[in-house]
């Protein structure tokens, strides 16, 4: 061994248990798996674990929609997720669930320690409540305009545009995602984690070099704006763990989700009958290394809350966070309508796992850059690199060795200096794998592949094979080519596990990092079989079409506008009779200064004037065109005080929003003030 063996615990972010794994998820799991496989090749003791994130309101509501229990739903989803990851050869040592006894015990332990140490605060807060569904709304079930950057359609806990976090009550014009209703405020006692108490520790950790520069810079912005206490409780109804000694209060999903890393590892230790490793890895002075691979959208939780929770409860902090960017397809956000929102299982019906593993790896670096899966470039790169450069190197030499020399390689290297060039590259390539500069590693390997193919081209074994008395030269040349191929595949083994197994079967030896210093001399290889097939754009077309069909099938029970806006609960005739709908004449329509959504309408009800603010500006950029039109309004709606004045009713419109809003009009002959029945 050239280095001291390390104890390493590696995690990926926990997939949420209410949906299928897609190619966006796979970037992270492939990145982590490549790194883990490299560490194992170098002799390190690696535990690679993950779990499903199985709690929260979304899971509770989806299970209700499906007519099953949350436990049944997350159980089925866990099996699907594990099947997908296995299909991509993600080499987890354990895959668990946050809905487990290990996670419950650890969540309660950490909470209790934080409380005993004075880091849990209780206070009554005003919280958004859905009056139609009779439930408090979790952060992710409220949408509105970000209070910081003013981006629309943002969730209630953090902005996906500027990265800011905030309270749902700070959202501008909030709406319930569950019912579409405007939430009302209600008081509730909540429990808060005192994050500001850890500001000094977190800043020191940030400056320690444990984080990527981009992450550290972002954290500095958060420190400068001031850390806030973190709400860690949610009110019933909620699917999760009830807080000890607090009936009707549950741990917020983001409290027990990262603890799921610990829960999954403890479950693994229990399976092994190993009662000491959990403490060895998680105790405060542990010499083990702990790495979290995560996406840039959850940096805030992992870089602030998680290390602070661990510090406050007497556990060790992560050695590092490895953060990656998002996945785009063909230069754009993944789209269901375009067929580029591709599930992992769909991919495996059309391509092998190694192809995507290679393409992602070739594009990854240690930076937090987005990765574009350009499907045409994908086909070209896989064919050019894996097929033409690497596999072809074996095929053009193996035939001669099998047919002319019974599979036995030469006893000496034809070009020891060239072989040394290949083995000397192990230092640079190994450092690239270690530092997650995956793209650099691939470039170095492909440069060697080009060198190997030039050697074969120059030696021309197909010519030598036809010349009398040159059998020894032919064996030496082809053996050299196969030995160079072996070194290349050893370097690529973390990326291409399926191809590597086939290569090991052909070479009749394991691809080992430490073994490349010794070439295969006088060694017998097995009969050569096709190692990898070319791919083409027809497969891409079929993949995209299949993804489109899956979307259609999922939407089949309900089509059209009903798919996005289902019919609400049945009401009685008496309920409907309370709503007074009237025909109104639009006398005037104008922009509202200070608002990019509202128009101010002056309506004539046949003897009574009404002032109404309506959010239809995006569909009617010329308000003057509305003057003189008849429409329908809710005439007995209580006046609503707004920033721009008092709105005395509501006009009726259809459509999903944006430019697709259509003001309703009565048939010809209807007069202002007439009731709509």
From Swiss-Prot:
Enumerate the residues binding Zn(2+).
146, 149, 159, 162
Q: Which cofactor does it need?
A: Zn(2+)
Q: Which Pfam families match?
A: Anticodon_3, tRNA-synt_1g, tRNA_bind
* Domain (tRNA-binding): residue spans on this chain: 575-677
Which superkingdom is the protein from? Bacteria
Q: GO cellular component annotations, sorted alphabetically?
A: cytosol
BP GO annotations? methionyl-tRNA aminoacylation
Q: Which UniProt keywords apply?
A: Aminoacyl-tRNA synthetase, ATP-binding, Cytoplasm, Ligase, Metal-binding, Nucleotide-binding, Protein biosynthesis, RNA-binding, tRNA-binding, Zinc
List its EC numbers. Answer: 6.1.1.10
> Which CDD domains does the record match to this protein?
Anticodon_Ia_Met (cd07957), MetRS_core (cd00814), tRNA_bind_EcMetRS_like (cd02800)
Whom does it interact with, and what assembly results?
Homodimer.
Protein name per UniProt: Methionine--tRNA ligase
Per the record, the gene is: metG
């Amino acid at each position: 061994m050239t280095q001291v063996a390390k104890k390493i615990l590696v995690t990926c972010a926990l997939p949420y248990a209410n949906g299928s794994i897609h190619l966006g998820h796979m970037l992270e799991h492939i990145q982590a798996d490549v790194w883990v496989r490299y560490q194992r090749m170098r002799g390190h003791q690696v535990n690679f674990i993950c779990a499903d994130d199985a709690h929260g309101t979304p899971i509770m509501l989806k299970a209700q929609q499906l007519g099953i229990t949350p436990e049944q739903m997350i159980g089925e989803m866990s099996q699907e997720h594990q099947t997908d990851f296995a299909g991509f050869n993600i080499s987890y040592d354990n895959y668990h669930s946050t809905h487990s006894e290990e996670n419950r015990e650890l969540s309660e332990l950490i909470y209790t320690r934080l409380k005993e140490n004075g880091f849990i605060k209780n206070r009554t807060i005003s919280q958004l409540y859905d009056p139609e569904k009779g439930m408090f709304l979790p952060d992710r079930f409220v949408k509105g305009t970000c209070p910081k950057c003013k981006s629309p359609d943002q969730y209630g806990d953090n902005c996906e545009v500027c990265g800011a976090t905030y309270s749902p009550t700070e959202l501008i014009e909030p709406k319930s995602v569950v019912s579409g209703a405007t939430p009302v405020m209600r008081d509730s006692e909540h429990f808060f984690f005192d994050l500001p108490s850890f500001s000094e520790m977190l800043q020191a950790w940030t400056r320690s070099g444990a984080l990527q520069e981009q992450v550290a810079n972002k954290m500095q912005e958060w420190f400068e704006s001031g850390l806030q206490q973190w709400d860690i409780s949610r009110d019933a109804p909620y699917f999760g763990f009830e807080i000890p000694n607090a009936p009707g209060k549950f741990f917020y999903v983001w409290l027990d989700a990262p603890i799921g890393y610990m829960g999954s590892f403890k479950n693994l230790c229990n399976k092994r009958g190993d009662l000491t490793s959990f403490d060895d890895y998680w105790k405060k002075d542990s010499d083990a290394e702990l790495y979290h691979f995560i996406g840039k959208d959850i940096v805030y939780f992992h870089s602030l809350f998680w290390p602070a929770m661990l510090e406050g409860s007497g556990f060790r902090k992560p050695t590092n966070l490895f953060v990656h960017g998002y996945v785009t397809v063909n230069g754009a956000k993944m789209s269901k309508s375009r067929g580029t929102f591709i599930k992992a299982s769909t991919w495996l019906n059309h391509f092998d796992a190694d192809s995507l593993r290679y393409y992602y790896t070739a594009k990854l670096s240690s930076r937090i850059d987005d990765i574009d899966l350009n499907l045409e470039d994908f086909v070209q790169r896989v064919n050019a690199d894996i097929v033409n450069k690497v596999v072809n190197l074996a095929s053009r030499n193996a035939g001669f060795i099998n047919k002319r020399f019974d599979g036995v390689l030469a006893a000496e290297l034809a070009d020891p200096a060239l072989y040394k060039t290949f083995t000397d590259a192990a230092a640079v390539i190994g450092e690239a794998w270690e530092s997650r500069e995956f793209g650099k590693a691939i470039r170095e390997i492909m440069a060697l592949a080009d060198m190997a193919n030039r050697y074969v081209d120059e030696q021309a074994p197909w010519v030598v094979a036809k010349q009398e008395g040159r059998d020894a030269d032919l064996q030496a040349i082809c053996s050299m080519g196969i030995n160079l191929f072996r070194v290349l595949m050893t370097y690529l083994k973390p990326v291409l596990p399926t191809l590597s197994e086939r290569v090991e079967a052909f070479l009749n030896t394991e691809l080992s990092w430490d073994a490349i210093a010794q070439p295969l001399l006088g060694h017998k290889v097995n009969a050569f079989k096709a190692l990898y097939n070319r791919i083409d754009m027809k497969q891409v077309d079929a993949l995209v079409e299949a993804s489109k069909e899956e979307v259609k099938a999922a939407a089949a029970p309900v089509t059209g506008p009903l798919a996005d806006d289902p019919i609400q609960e049945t009401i009685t005739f008496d309920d409907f009779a309370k709503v007074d709908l009237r025909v109104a004449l639009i006398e005037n329509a104008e922009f509202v200064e200070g608002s990019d959504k509202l128009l101010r309408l002056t309506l004539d009800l046949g003897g009574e004037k009404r002032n109404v603010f309506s959010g239809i500006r995006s569909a009617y950029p010329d308000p003057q065109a509305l003057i003189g039109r008849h429409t329908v309004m809710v005439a007995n709606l209580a006046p609503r005080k707004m920033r721009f004045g008092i709105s005395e009713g509501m006009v009726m419109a259809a459509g999903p929003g944006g430019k697709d809003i259509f003001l309703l009009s009565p048939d010809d002959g209807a007069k202002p003030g007439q009731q709509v029945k």
